[in-house]
Amino acid sequence: MGGYVHDVEIEGGHTIVVDEPAFVEGGTDAGPSPTRLVAAGLAGCTAVTMEMYAARRGWDVGAVEVDVDVEYEDFAPLSFAVTLRLPAGLSEEQRQRLLAVAAKCPVHRLLAGETEVVISDRIEDLPDA
C-alpha cells in the first residue's frame, strides 16, 4: 500500500482500511482517517452503551442515533462534540439517565483520560515480504 493507506486488522477477523484525506499530502482518501475512526468508535460505543442500559431496565427505546463532530486545529483534534438523538416518547427522567450513561461508555472514558494507554518499548521486525 502506498502513502498512508493501511489495512488495520481488528480482533474478530475484521479489517479496516485507514488513510488520510486527499487534501493531506500523501493521503488518498482510501478509507477513514484514524481520527474519524475514533469518532465513529465514540458514536458506536455511546449508542450501544445507552441501548444496553435501556434494555436492562426494560425500556423500549427503539433506535438511538449518535453524531460526533470533530473540531480540528492544524489537523489535530481539539474536541469531540457528541449529539444524542433519542425517541420523543421517553420521559425526562429516562432522557437524563441515558445522557448520564452516554458519558460512561468505554471509548468516552478512554478519551477523557480515564484509561491508561501504554506504548510498548518493545519493537519487532516486520517479516520479510
Please state what every model-predicted region is.
Residues C45-T46:
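Alpha-helical metal-binding/catalytic segments enriched in His/Glu/Asp
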